[in-house]
Each structure stands twice: as structure tokens, then as C-alpha cells.
From Swiss-Prot:
Required for normal heme biosynthesis. It comes from the Eukaryota. GO terms for cellular component: mitochondrial membrane. Belongs to the TMEM14 family. InterPro entries: TMEM14 (IPR005349), TMEM14_sf (IPR044890). It comes from Danio rerio. This is Transmembrane protein 14C. It is found in: Membrane. It is a multi-pass membrane protein. Disruption phenotype: Morpholino knockdown of the protein results in profound anemia without affecting erythroid specification. The chain crosses the membrane at residues 3-23, 25-45, 52-69, 81-101.
Length: 107
């Protein structure tokens, strides 16, 4: 059973981004979205750590954030926060996709 450190790091990045948005701009929607999506990503990382084939919560959270923040980045061209989160989400999608393509390992 391998721990999904990348998934936990991604969850921490998303949640801390929401907190930073609240502290800097007083944005309650940023705080709520950051904590909800960070929590979902953290839960997905926990599930992936328990069963490497169970990637669906992580896939949904990172895919949704990649789409939403990618659209925001396309419209605003601002690296932070939209570009950073969109990029991290695309990297998580690539990691999850690569994990799906690997053969299962016998333990």
C-alpha cells in the first residue's frame, strides 16, 4: 500500500489557495471552493492510498478544477490563482491517467 503523496500535496495546494484567497481578498466563495475541492482531493488521495485502482474521486475533483480554473485562466491570463491551479490539476489528471495505464502489480 503506497501513500499518494502527490494527491495529498495537490489537496493541500487547493485548500491553501482557498484560504489565501480569503485572507487576501476576503473572498468567501474562494474559501468555500478551496476547502470543498481540497477536501475532495484529500479524500481521493486517501482512497488511492488504500486502493490504487480507486481513482474516481481524485479524477472528478482534479478534472472539475482543471476545467473551471482553465477557463478562468483563459479569460484572465493571470497565473495566480487560476493558472497555478489549472496547471496542477492537469498534472494530477496526467498522473491519474498514467496510473490507469499501468499494469496492476501483484503484491
Amino acid at each position: 500500500m503506497a501513500v499518494d503523496w502527490a494527491g495529498y500535496g495537490y489537496a493541500a495546494l487547493v485548500a491553501s489557495g482557498g484560504v489565501i484567497g480569503y485572507v487576501k481578498a476576503g473572498s468567501v466563495p474562494s474559501l468555500a471552493a478551496g476547502l470543498v475541492f481540497g477536501g475532495l482531493a484529500g479524500f481521493g488521495a486517501y482512497q488511492t492510498s488504500q486502493d490504487p485502482g480507486n481513482i474516481w474521486v481524485s479524477l472528478a475533483a482534479s478534472g472539475t478544477l482543471a476545467a473551471i480554473m482553465g477557463k478562468r485562466f483563459y479569460n484572465s491570463r493571470k497565473i495566480t490563482p487560476a493558472g497555478l491551479i489549472a496547471g496542477a490539476s492537469v498534472l494530477m489528471l496526467a498522473k491519474l491517467g498514467a496510473g490507469m495505464l499501468q499494469k496492476p502489480q501483484k503484491s
